[in-house]
Amino acid sequence: MNHSFLRSVRSFSFLLGMTSLLTACDDDSETASVNKIDLAFQALSDNNQLLQFNANNVASAPTAVAITGLQSGEKILSVDYRPATGQLYGLGSTSRLYVINPTTGVARALGAGPFTPAINGTSATIDFNPTVDRLRLVSNTGQNLRLNPETGTVAVTDGTINGAATATVSAVAYTNPVAGASTTVLFDIDPTTDKLYRQDPPNDGTLVAIGDLGVNATGTAGFDIAADDNNAFAALTVNSRSGLYRIDLTTGRATLYDNFPTNTTIIGVAIPTKAVAYGVDSDNNFVAFNPTSPQTQVTKPFTGLQSGERIVGLDMRPLNGQLYGLGSTNRLYTINLASGAAAVVGAGAPLPLTGTNFGFDFNPTVDRIRIISDAGVNLRVNPTDGVALVDGVLNPGTPSVTAAAYTNNFAGATATVLYDIDSNTDILYRQDPPNAGTLVSVGPLGVNTTGVNGFDIGGTSGTGFAVLTVGTTASVYTINLTSGTATKGADLPRPLQAMAVGLGF
C-alpha cells in the first residue's frame, strides 16, 4: 500500500474534520441542541394575524386568527400581555393602542383617537413595565415613550435611544412580568447590529451592550420574557426564515428552537402572564395574588382615602381595565393597580348606601356599577361621575347579599347575568331583573360562609371565583353558576374583603 497516499488521506480527513468543527462553532447559535420547554405563546404575523404556538413545537402551523376592528389599512406592529390584568394589548400603526381578544382576534381601541406624539418610525415595539403598569414603546428611529394602558395615551415622552450609535431597536422586553413586581430590567434586541442590549435607565434610553446574538438577523424581531422563570424568547428572521430563538439574557446569545412554518413571518411574541386577582385584607391593605396559588401575595397600603376609611368593594371596568373601589364612607374611587393609590370619582359626594357588607360589580353591557348591600340596597352608579340611580330593594323577604358578579365580563358584551351570594342563607342567587332587585335561587353553596367575602367572574374563562371565610379559614373557591356549589381551592393567608379578577382570566 502507498504510505504517502495514506498520509494524504489522513491529512485531508483531519482538515475536513476541522472545517466541519469550525463551521459548527460558527453556527452554534442556530444549530445547538436544546431541551425545549412547554410554553404557550401568541405570535403576531406580518399580515395582522395571531397564531398560538407552543415553544416545544413551532414548526406545525396552527389555525391563524385574523385581527379585526382596526382602522382601514392599519397594521398591528407589536403585542404584549398586561401583567396587571392578563389582557393582550396591541400597538396599531395609526398610533392607537388596542386590547385584543386572542381567541376571536377582535381588537378594541382605547381612547378617542390616536395618541400624541405619534409613532415616529416604520416599526415600533411595546412591552409592559410590571412595576408601574405602563407600556414602554420604542421605535426604530429611537423614539422612547411610556403609554397609559387604561387611556391609550402617552404618559411620558422619554429620552431618545442612545449609547449605541448604529443601533436600531426592533424589540423590547421586561423581566419579572408579574403583577406587583418590585424590580424589573428592560432588554432590547437590535437586528442591525445583531446585539442584545440592556436599556438602563429605561427612561433615559441609554443602551448598554450585553453581547452578540450570534446570528445575522434581518427585518423586524419579536421578543418577550416568561413570568415563571424569566426565560426569554425572540422571533428572528435569519437567512430569510422566521424562527423561534431562546435568548440568553446574560450573554445575548440566540439559540434556535425551531423555524416557524414556511412562508410565515413572525414580528411579535407575547407570552401569557400569570392569573391575577385583587382583594382587601383586614388591615385595609391592597392585596394582589394568583387565585390558583394565593399564599404568595403582594401587599400595599391604600392611599388617598378619607381618614379611617376602608375599601369594601372592588371591580375592574371592562371598558378600559381600570380598577374601581367602594369606600366605607360611601365614596367611589379609581385605584392604581401598581401602587394602590385611590382617586375619588366625580365630586366625591357619598352614595345613598346603608349596610355593612356590599356587592360591587360592573355591568359590561351598559358600563355601570351595580352596588348592593346586606341591607337590601340596590344601586346603579355611573363610573365617570359617581352619580347613582336607586333601583328596587332586594326581594323577596330580607336577603343578606354580600357579594355580586356579572357574566360576560368584557367590553362589548351584549348580554349578561347578575349573580349574588347571600352569606346568611349560603345560597347563590340570580338577580333577575337586576333593576327590580328580584332574587331567584340557583342553589346552595354547600359551605357556611361569613359576610367577609368577595366574588367575581372571569372575563375570559367565565369561571366564578370567590374568596370565602368558612369558620376561621379563608380560601379561594370556584362557584358553579348552574348549581351554586362552591368548590374549595387553595387557602388564603388571611381573610379578604372584596375580590376582583384580572379581565384576561
Descriptions of predicted regions:
Residues M1-T23:
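Sec-dependent bacterial lipoprotein signal peptides
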Residues L15-F41:
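Bacterial Sec-dependent N-terminal signal peptides
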Residues V34-T68, E74-I76, T85, R253, ...:
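N-terminal segment immediately downstream of the Sec signal-peptide cleavage site
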Residues A40-L44, Q87-G90, Y98, R134-L137, ...:
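Conserved beta-propeller blade signature
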Residues N47-F53, R96-N101, Q143-N148, T193-D200, ...:
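Structural motif
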Residues A55-V58, N101-G105, N148-G152, D200-D204, ...:
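Short loop/turn segments that connect beta-strands within beta-propeller blades
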Residues P62-Q71, V106-P117, V154-G163, T206-V215, ...:
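A short beta-strand motif characteristic of beta-propeller blades
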Residues G73-D80, F115-F128, N162-P177, N216-I225, ...:
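Repeated scaffold domains used in trafficking and secretory/extracellular systems
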